[in-house]
Amino acid sequence: MNKLIDFSKGLVPVILQHAQTDSVLMLGYMNEEAYQKTLKEKKVTFFSRSKQRLWTKGETSGHFQHVESIHLDCDQDAILIKVMPQGPTCHTGSLSCFNSEIESRFKIQALAQTIHQSAKANQSNSYTQYLLKEGIEKISKKFGEEAFEVVIGAIKHNREEVINETADVMYHLFVLLHSLDIPFSEVEQVLAHRHQKRNNFKGERKEVREW
């Protein structure tokens, strides 16, 4: 395929796409050397325009992008690489770098980013910082309390209460994940893997590991 790509015109844009979920992960650029290195090592390497050198994605964080397949567009001037990410793609801890939509609805990844930012900010009135300073036992207790509130609302068939308490559960879940240094992208990867499975009936004794 490299014979079809004309690198003489400059850097070629490269889109990374999750091989299982088809989510668009990030945009980078390659010169011929970066492309050849990617082919050889099966890990995505870009040419960094800011550093002016080859840059293997994950070389610092360990969050490598493992190549599954490579595709060329019809004009032969852009590349799509389907990858299996080894951890989050974005430096913010998100699975994808494309999270800042214009006039978009709220998405769950934004909650993880907000908690990540709140944890780093120096705000004395931050509830997120309060929970993190109190530690995992406090966070786990709050998570359990909010989950129980969902159960109570469900038993009462109180739709509004279930919705509101579920939002509280999600917030405390993400604080818990942050406190344990677990990026939500790892949860997404497990969900994506299980989504590929079918007819995983639990039965009477078998523990649920796949849906």
UniProtKB/Swiss-Prot annotation:
Keywords: Amino-acid biosynthesis, ATP-binding, Cytoplasm, Histidine biosynthesis, Hydrolase, Multifunctional enzyme, Nucleotide-binding. Its EC number is 3.5.4.19, 3.6.1.31. It is found in: Cytoplasm. It is an enzyme of class 3 (hydrolase). The keyword DNA repair does not apply. Pfam families: PRA-CH (PF01502), PRA-PH (PF01503). InterPro entries: His_synth_HisIE, HisE, PRib-ATP_PPHydrolase-like, PRib_AMP_CycHydrolase_dom, PRib_AMP_CycHydrolase_sf. Residues 1-107 are annotated as: Phosphoribosyl-AMP cyclohydrolase. Its main location: cytoplasm. SUPFAM superfamilies: all-alpha NTP pyrophosphatases, HisI-like. It catalyses: 1-(5-phospho-beta-D-ribosyl)-ATP + H2O = 1-(5-phospho-beta-D-ribosyl)-5'-AMP + diphosphate + H(+); 1-(5-phospho-beta-D-ribosyl)-5'-AMP + H2O = 1-(5-phospho-beta-D-ribosyl)-5-[(5-phospho-beta-D-ribosylamino)methylideneamino]imidazole-4-carboxamide. Pathway: Amino-acid biosynthesis; L-histidine biosynthesis; L-histidine from 5-phospho-alpha-D-ribose 1-diphosphate: step 2/9; Amino-acid biosynthesis; L-histidine biosynthesis; L-histidine from 5-phospho-alpha-D-ribose 1-diphosphate: step 3/9. CDD domains: NTP-PPase_HisIE_like. One of its GO terms (molecular function) is phosphoribosyl-AMP cyclohydrolase activity. GO terms for cellular component: cytoplasm. GO terms for biological process: L-histidine biosynthetic process. Residues 108-211 are annotated as: Phosphoribosyl-ATP pyrophosphohydrolase. In the N-terminal section; belongs to the PRA-CH family. PANTHER family: HISTIDINE BIOSYNTHESIS BIFUNCTIONAL PROTEIN, HISTIDINE BIOSYNTHESIS BIFUNCTIONAL PROTEIN HISIE. This is Histidine biosynthesis bifunctional protein HisIE. It comes from Staphylococcus epidermidis (strain ATCC 35984 / DSM 28319 / BCRC 17069 / CCUG 31568 / BM 3577 / RP62A). The gene is hisI.
